[in-house]
A protein has these predicted regions:
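Basic nucleic-acid-binding interfaces
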Residues: 1-21, 27-70
Length: 70
């Protein structure tokens, strides 16, 4: 799965917004129950499974819930 697709799913389905760019990485954030939640997504053609799980962990999203939106 590409970084671009992950960003689209996080923004369209989970309410994240792009808060910045740094080289080939995109910072995403959202306010969740009074807390600010954020993650960084590398814009690679193919993300490794461990990288994707790390992104979801930082975003506080259950991987099963994320994969339901594919």
């Amino acid at each position: 799965m590409s970084g671009e697709k992950v960003v689209k799913i996080l923004c369209n389905r989970f309410g994240f917004t792009v808060s910045g760019y740094s080289g080939s990485h995109v910072r995403l954030s959202k306010a969740d129950k009074g807390m600010k939640v954020g993650t960084v997504v590398p814009m690679h053609d193919e993300l490794k499974p461990g990288t994707l799980h790390g992104i979801l962990r930082l975003a506080k999203i259950d991987p099963e819930e994320f994969f339901r939106h594919l």
